[in-house]
Every structure is written in C-alpha cells, then in structure tokens.
C-alpha cells in the first residue's frame, strides 16, 4: 500500500514539473512518447510572452530604419549629380563665350593690321564651300581677281611675296608706281626737256600730298603768290600750256600716270 502511494506521488510530481518547466532536462527518464505532450503548452506560453510578441515589430522597425538611410543616400546622390551637370553646362558656356571673345578680338586686330586678310576671313566664314576647302576657294578667288583686274592681282601677289610690302603697303605701292613712272619720264626727257623739268618739280609736290596733307595745303596756298606770275600773266598762261601739253604727252605714253595728274594739277591750279 505504501509503495502504491509513493508511486502515485512520484507520478504527480512528474506531471506538475512538466507543466511548469519550460525546458525538459536531457537526463530525464521520461519516454519519447511523453515529450510531444509537453511541447504545445510550452509554445503557447512562449507566444504569450511580451518579448516574443515584440520581436516581429522590432524586425520591422529595424528594417525601416535601415531602409531610410539608403533612400536618403540615393536622393543625395541624385541631387549631387544634378548640381554637377548644371555646373558643367555653365562652365562649357563660359568657355564658349571666352573663345568667342578671343576670336572677335583676333578678328578686330586682323582688321586693323590687314584689311584684305580680314575680308578674306569674313568670306571664308560666310561661305560653306570655303569652309570645306579653303585652299581651293582662295585659288578660285585669286583667279577671279586676276581675270577682273590683272593690275590688282599683280599688286596683291607682290604684297604677299614681299615682307616690306606686308609691313607698309602704302609706301610699297608708291615705290612701285614711281618705278612705273620712271620709263615715261625718261621718254619725256628725251622728247621735251622743259616738260621733263616741270614734271620733276611736280613730283615732290605729289609726294608731299601723299605724305603730309597739311603741308600740301600750305603749299597750295603759297603757289599763287608767285611774283613772276603776278607780274606777267603771259608767263602764267605759257606755263599752264606747257603743263597741259606735258600731261597730254604723259597720258599718251603712260595712261596709269595720267590718272595721277588731277592730284598734281590741283597742286598747280
């Protein structure tokens, strides 16, 4: 009887310890069939615990916290790329403006230094065919100039080939004109020495008119004050006739020289 009571108490103790304990010890002698009976109450008790209930919420919160910096970083990177694009466009526009200003300044300097080269540059930039092949376009322009005005073409070739002419084109052209005048003057000296001497006197006046306009105008005012002309009007008429005859001879010998005679005649009359 006592053994039966003791066995019942032991079995009761095992049942009570199984319901209250959360972990079954490994050294338990309970059979494997008894263990599944204790698992559902343990899991039910664990699910009812506050820490276990808060764990999914903590996971959601941590995931949202981790996702917020990623979104902020993405927004910051997009903003940074936008700012970089805007600054790059502004820098490109500034560079284009600087290049245009440099090009305009160089064109203005070219226009002051060499008007012919400036006009050629303007024609090259305004013509699409000239942009494609500038060398062929320049050759075509030179051929057209040679056919239209051979004298101007020869002068242009001389200006391009002579470094002195490039520095001072006006003086070089005057020298070339005087060299063209010399043969006509030699013929005039052989035909009419008096007219030749008058022409030699007129040449310095013409040079003075080209070099210094003020001095030329002063000389214009002093020319009428000639005592020989004032005293004898016949002398003045004779001199005028000699000058006109010399002009006619020069126009027959050298038409280019006759084009300059209005300047010389203005200095006399």
Curated annotation (Swiss-Prot):
Residues 1-21 form the signal peptide. Keywords: Seed storage protein, Signal, Storage protein. GO terms for molecular function: nutrient reservoir activity. The keyword Signal applies. It holds the Pfam family Zein. Coiled coil: none annotated. Belongs to the zein family. Major seed storage prolamin. This is Kafirin PGK1.
């Amino acid at each position: 009887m006592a053994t039966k009571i003791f066995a019942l108490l032991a079995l009761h103790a095992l049942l009570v310890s199984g319901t209250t304990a959360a972990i079954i010890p490994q050294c338990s002698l309970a059979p494997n069939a008894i263990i599944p009976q204790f698992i559902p109450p343990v899991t039910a008790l664990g699910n009812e615990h506050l820490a276990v209930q808060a764990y999914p919420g903590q996971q959601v919160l941590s995931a949202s916290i981790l996702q917020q910096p990623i979104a902020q970083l993405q927004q910051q990177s997009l903003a940074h790329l936008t700012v970089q694009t805007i600054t790059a466009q502004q820098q490109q526009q500034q560079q284009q403006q600087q290049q245009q200003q440099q090009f305009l300044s160089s064109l203005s300097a070219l226009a002051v230094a060499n008007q012919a080269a400036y006009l050629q540059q303007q024609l090259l930039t305004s013509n699409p065919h000239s942009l494609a092949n500038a060398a062929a376009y320049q050759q075509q322009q030179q051929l057209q100039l040679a056919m239209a005005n051979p004298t101007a073409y020869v002068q242009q070739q001389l200006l391009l080939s002579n470094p002195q002419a490039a520095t001072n084109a006006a003086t070089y052209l005057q020298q070339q004109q005087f060299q063209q005048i010399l043969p006509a003057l030699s013929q005039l000296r052989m035909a009419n020495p008096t007219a030749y001497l008058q022409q030699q006197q007129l040449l310095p006046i013409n040079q003075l008119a080209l070099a210094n306009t003020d001095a030329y105008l002063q000389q214009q005012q002093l020319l009428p004050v000639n005592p020989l002309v004032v005293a004898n009007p016949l002398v003045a008429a004779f001199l005028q006739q000699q000058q006109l005859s010399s002009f006619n001879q020069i126009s027959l010998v050298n038409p280019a020289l006759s084009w300059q005679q209005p300047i010389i005649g203005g200095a006399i009359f």
